[in-house]
Structures are given as C-alpha cells and as structure tokens.
Amino acid sequence: MCKRLFLLASLILVLAGAPSVFGEPIGVFNFSQDVGTPGNPSGTGGTRYVATNEYLILAGGSDIWGTADQFHYAYNKVSGNVRFELSPGWDIGGGNYWAKVETMLRVNTDTGSIAYATATRRGDNTDPGNAVVHNWVGAQIRSVTNAGMWGGVEWGGSTPSKIATQRVVDNGYQLVQSLVDYGSGWQNLDTRWVPSLPDQLLLGAAVTSHDNWWLVQARVGNVAYTQNPGLVGIKTIGDPLPVACGDIPGFRIETIKAGEWSDLGGGYAAAEELVTTHAIGGDPGREYGSRIDPVVNLLDNGNFNFGDDTSFPGIDPYEKPVVEPAGGDDDDNYATLVTACIQLTKGLHVIGGHSDDAVKVEIGGVEIGRTVSWNTTDMFVFTAPATGIYSFRAVMYEQGGGSDLELLEALPDGRLILLGDVAAGGSAVYVPEPATIALLGFGGLAMLRVRRKR
C-alpha cells in the first residue's frame, strides 16, 4: 500500500498545476474529463499539454471492457468525416498490464454509450514501473447503448507506432474504421458499418489503469485530427464473370455432416475439405442434401436476426418456418456451401451475415470477410471494380450447440436485409447454371480471369 501511495503522490505531482478542469480547452482538446467513476479510490484523472502534439494523460479506472466504462477522456465534439490519431506511450505503467491507451469515438460521456475504439495496452507484467507499449492492438466495439464493450479484430507481433479511429461516410454508408500504423502507413484493423450514429460525436484519447487502486500516466504523441480522410484498406473484389451465369433467382445451398470418425474441430480447413471432397481425412461425410432458396435464412436451433427460417438441407427435412430444433433434433458437426452469381454495381458495397458457429464470404474470387463470433452479425465492406455479375461463395461450419446461417446486405439508407431480397432493394442473385459450374467451378473463376487478361 505504501508503494501505491508513493506512486499516486508522484503522479499527482507530475500533473500539478495542469489545466485539467473539466470542460476547459487543453491544447488540441476542447474537453478533458473522467468517464464513469475511475477516481474511487485512486483519485481523478487529468490531461496536460507538454509539447507540440504531445500530452500527458493521468487516469484511473477499472477498465474499458464489457460494461466497465471507467477512464479519463480527452476529446472534441466532431461532425462529418474525421480521423483522430496518436502515438501511444507510457510514462508510468502502474495498475494492471491491461491498462490501455485508446483512440475512441463515442456518442456521449455516459457510461454505456455506444463507442468504437482502437486500443493498445502496456507491457505484459505487473511491475508498476513498467512503461512499455505491448505488441498488441485491438478494435473495441459497443454498438448498442448499455451493452458490453466487446473485441473485434486483434493483432499482435509488433508494437504499433500510431493508432487511429475514424468515421467516414462513403456512397451513403456510414463506416467506422480502426487503423494501425507500424511505421509504413495506415493499415485497416477493423471496419464497421454504423448506420445509426448521429452526425455529432465525441472523438479523442481514452486512458484507463484497469485497476481502481492505481493511477497510470500515458504520454501520447503525434496527436492530430484530420478532416475528410479517405477509407483505408477496403478490399476490391475480382473482375465480373466473362460468361453467362444463370437466370433463376436464388442460391444453391449444400449441407453435409461429418463422418462417423471426424468432426469440424478444424474450423474452416475442415469445412472446406468436407464441402469440396465430401469427406474429412478420408472419412466420408453423411446426410448430404442440396436445395435452391431465394435467400439464405437457415435455422437448426437458436434464431438470430430474421424469422420465417428454413431448415438446412440434408441434415433435416424441409421446414418453413422451423420449429426448433429443426427435424426434432439438434445437429452438430456439419458444413454448408452456398454458391450463386450476384449482380453488383460499381463501387462500395456492404455484405455479410451471421452464423453459429462461423461463416466466410467470397465474392469475385476474393474473401471479403469472416464472422468474428457466433453471437455477432458482421458486415464486410468491399468495392466492386465494375458493374456486372460476380461469383459468390460462402462456407459455414457448425461444431456444436445452436446453429443458424443468415446472409445479409446493408443498404445505404441504413436497412439490413436478407441478401437476394430484390423487392427490398437488394442485389439480385442467380443460381449458377450446371454448364457454368462444370466449365468454371468456383475455384476456376479466377483461373479464367487470368487467362482472359493475357
């Protein structure tokens, strides 16, 4: 306890006389305040301008995670397209090795506010004097007021030189990006479609000690706000198909269960092997079935976004709507392959879905994304290089427990619809003709495009 009190006193002296009165401008920041109650018992936080684009931020707080919103926040009110960036650093680590420095976008300073952040943490030990930025960076997301803050994409291996969070509206889509710079330019850590955010938001630096008995002091540099930044790292899919695809609306859906001696414990690798060879490690799959549906809204057990589901083919008899569990049993260890041709306009699109356990989506021969968790809906942002018809492929797997699959499209007006729902304004999808599948397959499309370019 004596050591903690000494460290606390030292930190308070470092910021003594600093203009940290809540609401007063401090350098580039117009506001500096504690969020939640991080000052009990550690003491209140503050922000001090020490050099050009460099600040000391003193903070306590139990964490920025789940429903724990306890941190010090130096921020501005922003509108339109804007990026906030900083170089993370620590003067005194203190507290817990999960003490964090973040760039954070919020709706307000209430605990439980909708928030999107790019987070770093200090060194991987509990030495209070440790002042090292750990080689970890992660996106943090709270998309619903008073829900838990959860983790999106995380990277390790290198220490970031800069982090940033930005809001950009492009082609009608409002997007939030978490960005990381390892010294050679910005990289896209995570991109989120956020249709419901207001124009005016809070954007700035957040620091927490992850331990209310300690204060930590972060030293952040290269602090800057940038108006009208461009999107970073958005994938561009391959070329449109060079041949006709089909004129029957819908998707071809194929489901197969793992054999008696195998399972889907290998994740996507096992799922790919099962849907392409109908076996895993030579063990033949069972209960194969296929069907053509206008949309992909499948349920075995445990519904998510949309009702009026249909059962998975093969593993259960046809049901619409499904009475859970479909077929009267809870099926495990199966994979589903969805193929189609999709009509897209040139430019930005947002397509994704939900799956328990997981699904990945490929368009134009390029993987546009994978779901992060069984209990999240993940939408993937990409660009189509031209207006045309593109190959579409999705692979889903289920290991155990509840299971469903929804493929979704976001519209610029903020609506989320089932992919293929043309009546609602969505992109048209078509079942590939057998001749097209035989000629190209969905691994051969990229090969044909290469030959066509030569």
Regions found by a protein language model. Name each.
Residues 24-241:
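Extracellular glycan-recognition regions
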Residues 434:
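Residue-level detector of conserved catalytic or cofactor/ligand-binding positions
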Residues 225, 360, 446:
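Active-site micro-motifs of SAM-dependent methyltransferase domains
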Residues 62-63, 183, 356, 366, ...:
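Residue-level signature for short turns and capping positions that connect secondary-structure elements
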Residues 229-350, 354-430:
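Extracellular/secretory pathway-exposed regions associated with glycan biology
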Residues 163-166, 176, 349, 359, ...:
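Conserved beta-strand core positions
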Residues 2-22, 437-454:
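C-terminal cell-surface anchoring/sorting signal
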Residues 58, 85, 177-181, 352-354, ...:
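Beta-strand residues in well-ordered beta-sheet regions across diverse protein folds
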